[in-house]
Amino acid sequence: MWILIYLFIIWSSLRTWVTAVDSTTTVGDDLNETVSASVWPTMSPQMTVAFRSQRDVMGNLTIDQLPYVGLNLRRVLLNNETSMVNEGNNTRLLTLFKSMLSSEANAFVLDLEQYNNDLRVVDTTLLFSDVLIALQSFIFSTQNNLYANIIVLLLNISAPELDSTEYRHQNQTLNTTYILDKNLGNGFIYKPTDLQSDRAKNNTWNIYGKSSIDGWPTLGSVLYEQKKRLVIGELTDFFNETTAPYIFPHDVFHYEQGNSTLDCPSTVEGLTDLSSIHWRFLDSLFNSVDIKEYISCGLSPIISNSAYVNNVTQLADIIHEGSVWSWDSDQPSVTQSTSKSGSSSGTLEAYNCVLLYYFANNETVTWRVGNCYNSNIGLCRYENMAFRWLVRSNKATYFDFDSYQGSKCPDQYSFNIPRSPLEQRSFIAYMRNSSFSDTQIWIDLNSISVSNCWVSGGPYASCPYEKVISKRNFVTMMVPASVCSFALLCIVVYLSVLRVPIYDNRKNWRRVINKISKSELEGVPS
């Protein structure tokens, strides 16, 4: 019986241990997991964490207001300077395209032409279906909360040289729905019908709040609830709603080439007006300096630098400068634990909270990791107003600035963070108008729960990639169970080895009992 109890205890402890290990997602271990990129430079663990945390911060932004960094594939990949095009090396072209998908680029302009009731990539023998198969493979390999992101595919369709009757006939016989269903699958595509459904359910927003007329769903809704990964749009006027129901028409997107006609806003009114324009793309030549400025002005750059096709590293640097608009160049620091420690001066240290550094001389900001136990001022936002900020003058540690006991932000304000380049630009305008000098400000972003998992929601926010328990709490949970198991084991061993004394002296007890029984009288007393 004791053996069975002991085995049950051991089984329970092992089950708890296995459950905890299986349920814990250590984000640091996932830093080394990268999508296959045989040509494109692999993202470092630091870049991976920065890009992922930035995506998570933008989770409540609508997909039309996200900052995309894209590539014009015909100019970058398929220009005349590319020997691959002249050689007709389709395999290498697809390999490079797959590598580009695994970079930080998340928008692509693809030029297609009609070819025998099919679509073919201009200046190549590649079919549109070949590109879709490569895209499907990438989406399958990244269909999880760690790596999933929205991809925008913008199509330039070249019409065949036919008279109007033949053109209209070929356009109607071209079955784009079949091509997309067969080679990609419609489950990953966010379609015009999905947008209509979201608007009917009042699940869309614009800059002013919920809107069923011109609103769009949030990134979190599209990625995690609907499991959609791809938005396909047309830049020409080749398709219609009947022939291409999966593709958004050209008038949905604000797409410009060369120079932008949109002014870079510097006031809240200008920022609000710009935000009312959906999907703002600028197709032009960029370098690693000016691309950050265009991003901060609310535009999504489409890189058309044909000279960089043979210098992939330089092109990758430009994409990185544009895609990471928040963190400093050497941030965030990749750590292995979140446990607090004491410095030589006796103060507590936990470098798991984020400070926004404001530099007044050039009016720039950047994010850096700071010690959560240091006292700093914090950033507050007014209700759901995207561009209305307040910096509190009273200093506090990260844990005290926004805690269960209350927030340091006043009523109708909440501890917050700039979620996009435009919101960060509005914050800079606020700091300039308020005549702030260089300063460091707490923002609502930390990795207190799990190392390298940067989340918003205050110091007690949990990591979305960790289901049950973290490494830090694992030892705390296992120690009591292990001690109890060891104590019960000792008791079981003791009872199994050491017999009860009455059985140990059985002969002596029998002799005593016999002696006593002889002195007893038999029969009934008279």
Curated annotation (Swiss-Prot):
Protein name: Maintenance of telomere capping protein 6
Family membership noted in the UniProt record: Belongs to the MTC6 family.
Extracellular domain ranges by topology: 21-477
Topology of the protein relative to the lipid bilayer: Single-pass type I membrane protein
Superkingdom, taxonomy of origin: Eukaryota
Species classification: Eukaryota, Fungi, Dikarya, Ascomycota, Saccharomycotina
Primary role: May be involved in telomere capping.
Disulfide bridge map: none
Signal peptide boundaries: 1-20
Spans through the membrane: 478-498
Segments on the Cytoplasmic face: 499-526
Entry-listed glycosylation sites: 32, 60, 80, 89, 156, 171, 175, 202, 240, 259, 311, 362, 433
UniProt-listed Pfam families: TIM-barrel_MTC6
InterPro entries for this protein: Telomere_Capping_Maintenance
One GO CC term on file: membrane
Keywords annotated in UniProt: Glycoprotein, Membrane, Signal, Transmembrane, Transmembrane helix
Gene: MTC6
Subcellular location: Membrane
Coiled coil: none
